[in-house]
Curated annotation (Swiss-Prot):
<comment type="function">
    <text>Involved in pre-mRNA splicing.</text>
</comment>
<dbReference type="GO" id="GO:0071014">
    <property type="term" value="C:post-mRNA release spliceosomal complex"/>
</dbReference>
<feature type="compositionally biased region" description="Low complexity">
    <location>
        <begin position="367"/>
        <end position="377"/>
    </location>
</feature>
<feature type="region of interest" description="Disordered">
    <location>
        <begin position="519"/>
        <end position="583"/>
    </location>
</feature>
<keyword id="KW-0747">Spliceosome</keyword>
<dbReference type="InterPro" id="IPR017862">
    <property type="entry name" value="SKI-int_prot_SKIP"/>
</dbReference>
<keyword id="KW-0508">mRNA splicing</keyword>
<keyword id="KW-0539">Nucleus</keyword>
<feature type="compositionally biased region" description="Basic and acidic residues">
    <location>
        <begin position="519"/>
        <end position="538"/>
    </location>
</feature>
<feature type="compositionally biased region" description="Pro residues">
    <location>
        <begin position="233"/>
        <end position="244"/>
    </location>
</feature>
<feature type="region of interest" description="Disordered">
    <location>
        <begin position="1"/>
        <end position="68"/>
    </location>
</feature>
<feature type="compositionally biased region" description="Basic and acidic residues">
    <location>
        <begin position="569"/>
        <end position="583"/>
    </location>
</feature>
<feature type="compositionally biased region" description="Basic and acidic residues">
    <location>
        <begin position="386"/>
        <end position="424"/>
    </location>
</feature>
<feature type="region of interest" description="Disordered">
    <location>
        <begin position="177"/>
        <end position="253"/>
    </location>
</feature>
<dbReference type="InterPro" id="IPR004015">
    <property type="entry name" value="SKI-int_prot_SKIP_SNW-dom"/>
</dbReference>
<dbReference type="GO" id="GO:0000974">
    <property type="term" value="C:Prp19 complex"/>
</dbReference>
<feature type="compositionally biased region" description="Basic and acidic residues">
    <location>
        <begin position="203"/>
        <end position="225"/>
    </location>
</feature>
Amino acid sequence: MTSIAEGLFKSLPKPKYTGEEEELPQHGQRGPRIVGPGQLDDTQIVLRRTGPPPYGNRAGWRPRAPEDFGDGGAFPEILVAQYPLDMGRKGTQSKSNALAVQVDAEGKVKYDAIARRGHSDDRIVHASFKDLIPLRQRVDMGEVSLDRPSEEEVQAQMEKTKNALASLVSGAVAAQKPKNVKGGSRAEPTFVRYTPANQMGDTSRKNDRIMKIVERQQDPMEPPKFKHKKIPRGPPSPPPPIMHSPPRKLTAEDQEAWKIPPPVSNWKNPKGYTVPLDKRLAADGRGLQDVSINDKFAQFAEALFTADRHAREEVRLRAQMQQRLAEKEKAQKEEHLRALAQKAREERSRAQSRASHSPSRGRSRSRSYSDASSRSRTPSEDEEAARERERIRRERRQDAERQLRQSRMGTERRIQAMAREQNRDISEKVALGLAKPTQSSETMWDSRLFNQTSGLSTGFNEDNPYDKPLFAAQDAINSIYRPKPQADFDDEADAEGEMSKIQKSNRFEVLGRAKEGFRGAADAEERSGPVQFEKDTADPFGIDSMIADVTGGAGGAGQKRYGIQEAEPDSRGSKRARVDEEN
């Protein structure tokens, strides 16, 4: 067991502090140490020297304490602030707020020094709880004497107060008295004892006399007897010696360097001298100035040029990209419209082929039909004809309403409407006033004539002061085919005659190979009148019409309509057809 304890103690480090009293090391001791002569070394003896060090050993030395100056003054070769005998030094009172710790007779810290800071010693400062207790209730009441003072103390205090008041009053009165009036105050008389001496051999005894010496009375109104003269100022202290180099003769270079040109003004020449330009430039001092241009200007200009070039390149690339996107979008739109047109032509051709196999209804709507032919029609054909007439009336009414709205629109609204509807023929553009014909040579002017003085004001073309005709679009409107509103012809002969006249006119041959026609136009059915646009039907396969026919045949006549529900185009078809026939 002991071997284990010894091994454990050996493994532990040596403790720094123990509970026993031990000697502190030399560096931890404070204060003077008493050593024997054997422990003292010559290298440890340091003698304190007063006064400045000898010459040659003053490198880095600065006088700080009064002992450093010795019995002399400041050292001029040391360029620091020096105060021998503290002459010229400002008050050494510290500006710090730190206070020295003070204790009372009992060894307690006197914290009232904080409250007394900045006050005089005779000022009463209450800084403890004891000062708040009345004198009669204090514990040390017996130590304070409250007896009446004696007569001697009262007289001494009264005399002291009287003298203090008299000094204050006399000072105030003396300040009000004039200072330059004579005889204002007379000195007290002086008494002198006079004993006469022996004169002329007289040896008799002489009596002493008491003489009173009084200051002579002065007239306060007497003018001054002497005139005050100002004493001239004495000679000043001799000037300090100035060390000059020995005189030497000036060389030609020195004379040229010291040659100062006379002042030459650029605005005044009262004497009228003729000063050459080189002398003016020499007097101006421009040759002495070194003009230098900073390189930053060139760098800044180059940076601006590079930034501008990059910006223009970015704008160009952006514009090209936008143009490509617009062209691509336009091509897609044209392709879509072309596909729709092709689809419409194919549907129209199929409808034409189906209509050719079915019995023809005829194109004429004349009133010469007989009652026998009308009676021979089946009810289904009459209803179909009435439905077709109702559709045509509805389209005409919509066209009339659209034309009325367009006539009330402004030019900007017309342009916006045309932008929304790009796929319109030239007749509608002419109706809107957007198709401008090419001006003839008579209405075109040379722009160079407008810059000359000879013009309308000098009698040129006085009869026609307008550069454009008033109705520029009227010629284009008259030259473009516009079908008449009443497109219904009386008979087939009139329709065939109108068609033959249009075919013989050959109006559009100037535009190209018009006889061959356009691609897909041969499959389209013949058209009489203006181009009629077809709307997308909600029922392309005819399912709704088939259901309507079935429901109409079963009990459609007995259906009841509510509110503003429109009547079915199939209902009362026979009556509408009969009315149209009567008309």
